[in-house]
Structures are given as structure tokens and as C-alpha cells.
From Swiss-Prot:
The keyword Amino-acid biosynthesis does not apply. GO terms for cellular component: extracellular region; host cell nucleolus; host cell plasma membrane; membrane. Keywords: Host cell membrane, Host membrane, Host nucleus, Membrane, Secreted, Signal, Virulence. Induction: Expression is induced during host plant infection. The lineage of its organism: Eukaryota, Sar, Stramenopiles, Oomycota, Peronosporales. The keyword Transmembrane helix does not apply. Residues 1-20 form the signal peptide. It comes from the Eukaryota. Belongs to the RxLR effector family. The RxLR-dEER motif acts to carry the protein into the host cell cytoplasm through binding to cell surface phosphatidylinositol-3-phosphate. Disulfide bonds: none annotated. A motif (RxLR-dEER) lies at residues 48-63. This is RxLR effector protein PexRD49.
Length: 164
């Protein structure tokens, strides 16, 4: 930790010293009068040199920041689509959705609220942690399976009424 602070201090000293030295050198730069064809001398550090010449066209000047901004925007969009389509991200999103549905079921939220949260019967089945073989079986005394069947019939009736 002490070495880190020493390194940080040394870097700040080196870069701070070079910036102070370059600022004094920059302030002393002068453009000769013969190059300017003007009766007065002016200091380079006092004025902006962008569009200093009347012959430059503002529309033709290249702006580097706009180009960098568009490149960064396309890079972030491609990164976002790549990360969103990656398998680990999708698995994490499915686990998060499953735990969210489990919490809703434990709270005893109504079927209407589950439907409004776009919970599908398959998500409901997974959240109840039922075995896939139970889905097709005729076990009637399993309360979780009965709850699933009730939600599935409710969901299908809502989908039919929404379609008409």
C-alpha cells in the first residue's frame, strides 16, 4: 500500500512538472510579424488558432470528437447486443426471472397479477420446482401441481380473450 502511494506521488510529480514546464514554454511562443503581415504582434497562447485564417471553410473542417463519438456509440451498441445475446447473460437473466416468479408465488400474488407480469405457465411450473414428469401425469393430490393447472387454465383463458 505504501509503495502504491509512493508510485502515485512520483507519477504526479513527473507529470505535474512536465505540464508546468510546457505551459511556460507555450506562453513564450510568438509568431513573427513577417509571417502575419500585421502591424501588431500577438501571442499564440492568447487566441484560438482554429479558423484563424479567413480562407478556411467551417463546413469542411474536420472535427475529430464527432467521429470518435459515433465510433464509441456504435462500439457500445455492438457490445450491448453481444453481451445480451451471450449464453451466460441469458442464463443469469432466466435465473433472475425464476427467482422473481418464486417470490411472487410465495407472497400469494393473484393469478391476474401474475398474468400482468407476463408469467407464462412454463415459468410458473419451473418456479414451483415441479418435476417435468409430473406435467403429463394424472397425479391429483399434489397441491403444487393443482396450483399449476389452475394457473395454466387461467392463463389460457386470458390469452383466448385477448386474441378475440
Amino acid at each position: 500500500m505504501r509503495n502504491f502511494f509512493f508510485l502515485l506521488f512520483a507519477l504526479a510529480f513527473v507529470f505535474g512538472g512536465s505540464n508546468a514546464r510546457s505551459a511556460t514554454e507555450h506562453a513564450q511562443l510568438m509568431v513573427s510579424q513577417s509571417e502575419l503581415d500585421q502591424p501588431t504582434r500577438w501571442n499564440v497562447a492568447d487566441k484560438r488558432l482554429l479558423r484563424a485564417n479567413d480562407g478556411t471553410n467551417a463546413a469542411e473542417e474536420e472535427r475529430g470528437m464527432a467521429d470518435i463519438a459515433t465510433k464509441m456509440k456504435t462500439w457500445t451498441q455492438s457490445l450491448k447486443t453481444h453481451v445480451g445475446s451471450s449464453k451466460p447473460f441469458q442464463i443469469a437473466a432466466q435465473k433472475w426471472r425464476n427467482t422473481k416468479v418464486q417470490r411472487m408465488i410465495k407472497k400469494g400474488i393473484s393469478d391476474t397479477a401474475l398474468f400482468e407480469n407476463k408469467v407464462t405457465p412454463d415459468e410458473f411450473f419451473k418456479a414451483l420446482r415441479l418435476k417435468p414428469g409430473l406435467k403429463q401425469s394424472s397425479v391429483t393430490n399434489n397441491p403444487a401441481l393443482n396450483k399449476y393447472r389452475a394457473y395454466k387454465s387461467f392463463y389460457e383463458s386470458k390469452i383466448k380473450t385477448a386474441a378475440t
